[in-house]
Amino acid sequence: MTTESQLPLRSPDDVGYLRNISVDSASPDFEHEEANVKAVFTAMDQLMRTPTLVAGAVMPDACPTGDATIPVGGVVVAENAIHPGFHSADICCSVMATDFGRLHSPKNVLDVAQSVTHFGRGGRKRSAGIFKHLTQDLEDRIRSNPLFTAGDLKKAQLHLGTQGDGNHFLFVGESENYGGVTLVTHHGSRGFGASLYNKAMKIASRYRETISPETLPQNAWIPADTEDGQQYWEALQIVRDWTKLNHQVIHRLVAAKLGSEVFQDGVATEATFWNEHNFVFRKPSEDGSGPDLFVHGKGATPLDDSYLPDSHQGLRLVPLNMGQPILVVKGETSATNLGFAPHGAGRNMSRTQHKRIRRATGMSDQEIFDEETLGIDARFFSGGIDISELPSAYKNADQVQQQMEAFGLGTVVDRIQPYGCIMAGSPKSVERNRTN
C-alpha cells in the first residue's frame, strides 16, 4: 500500500516507448533473435511503469540485462530524476578515434598500441608513471566533491590509461573514404566510475524506500533537485572528463611512440573525436516550464549535438564486432530515435550460451578463433582466447545496419575497415600475464 506522498508504479501501457528493432524470419539465428526481442520488450514493458519515466526507446542492438530494467540498447527519459542503474557501473563507457593519416601502416600502429595499452582488472603499477597524466584541475574537482574519497582519487590516478576487460577493445583500421589509418579505443571509467556507481545506488535506494517503495531496487533514482542529486550530477561530469582523459592518454602514448603530431603539446587536434554510449544527459522540459529531463542511454549512442558539449562535426562511432567496420555516423533527433543510435551489434544470447553452442561443434577454442578471425589481426592481451568476444557472439552486423537505416537512426558517413584489434582475452590469462 502506498501513502499519498509516495509515487506508485504507473499503470501498464501508461507510457509507451519506441521499438526500433525487428526480427528477420529468414535469419539463420531467428530463434535466438525472436527470444531476445521478446525479452527486451518484456523488460521495457515493466520498466516504463517506473513513475519518473516519460519516454523510452530501444535500439536494434538491444539485449536484456535483467527483469524489468533497462536493456543494453535502451533509452529512457526521466523527469527530475537520475537513475544510476540506467547508466550502469561502467559509467561513460565510450569510444574515441584518432586518425593517424597514411604515414604509418596499420600493423605498425597496432604493434605500438599493444606495447602501451593495458587490459585486465585493476590499474597500472605506480612505477609506470601514467598517474602523472591526471590534470590538476581534475584532481581538484575530485577532491572537492563529497561523493569521492581518497581511495577514489587513487583509482583515478592508477586506472588512467587502462581499458579493463569484457567487450572493451583497441581497434586499428583504415578509413573507407580516404584510407587513413585510425585507432579506436573502447572502454569506460574503470574502478573510478564503478565506485561512484555503488555509492549512487545506495543513495537512490534510500530515496526509493521513502518516495516509491513499489519501484524495483534496480530502478531507484536520486531526485535531481536535491543536494544529493546536484552532487551526483557534478560527479558524473567529473567521471566523464576523466574517461575522456583515459582515452586520450592511450592515444597520446601511441602518437608519441609513432612520432606522430596528431597531438600538439599533448592536446588533441581535429584528428580525434569521441562519444560516450553509457551516460545520462540533461535537457529542459518540452515547454521550458517544468523540471529538467534526464535522458539515460545504456548502450545507446547520442546523435543529437545538444547532448555532447565537445562534439566534433557531429561525428559518432558505432562499432559492430572485430571483423566488421566501425561505422562513423551523424544524425539528429527524430520522431523515432529520441536523439540516439545503436552503440554496436549487441547480442542475442549470453556469453555462456554462446560458448556452449560454439564448442558443441567439437572445435577447439583455437580452431574457432582461427576460423572467425581469418583476414584480421586479432590479438588477446592476455594471450588466452575468449571466444565470447569473437564475431559470432554478436548479432548480425548487416541486419543492425539495415535496421539503423529503416528506423532513421543516423546516417553512415564513413566506415573504418578493420585491420586488427586487441581485447583482454581469458580473464585468468589476463591476471597471469600482467606486466604494467
Question: PLM ranges: what are they?
Answer:
Residues A97:
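N-terminal glycine-rich flavin-associated loop
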Residues H118-L147:
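Acidic low-complexity segments
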